């Protein structure tokens, strides 16, 4: 689509609900009538498995296949490898081959922009492309940030997780300065929140006071719930697993927040083109 928005979901700390957010944000946007592609940019293939594909190493065409074809200057077929999921999202899966590919990528020409070459073509078919990054700042994550319009940072109200935000923000700033000047941070999403515990309240307040002036902290908070873990284990979104629960309600609200930001940015882009 002309106004497709590409969002990287990233945090250098694992276990913060990043993949769960990618799945449920994607399905929430589909429920709003948007066309959505999810890209699994992690060799652990958590996103692929969270959508029910439990044997990722048996999948013949994955992100590493597509990126290798770009390096080899082969004809780009953007439909290659995309899986259509029953909940309405499309998926470009990943598997362990991405680890070996990341090593080979170091010697490639324009190595930071290989994924961007693919995304620039495939995004013509979508309203949103969501990239689930691995919890590190390796070459694949840098590719994701180079290809993205914006970043969403899921983090849980835990001291070490919030502390790690500073390092992540510096990394995003470096990519913006050196590779992708259009990159912006849409906001920080608080996940696995236990509202009745003091530590959750204190850390949430600390993050908002530390970053809320220059970076948006989303109004929506994703509550802690075993149902979200169960849904991932079942290979389903929270909407398919527990549609009337509090986590589904939170992700529905979050999807609307993200869509609202996207619409504002689209309107701004249209205005800039008219000038």
Where are these regions (language model features)?
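P-loop NTP-binding core
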Residues: 1-275
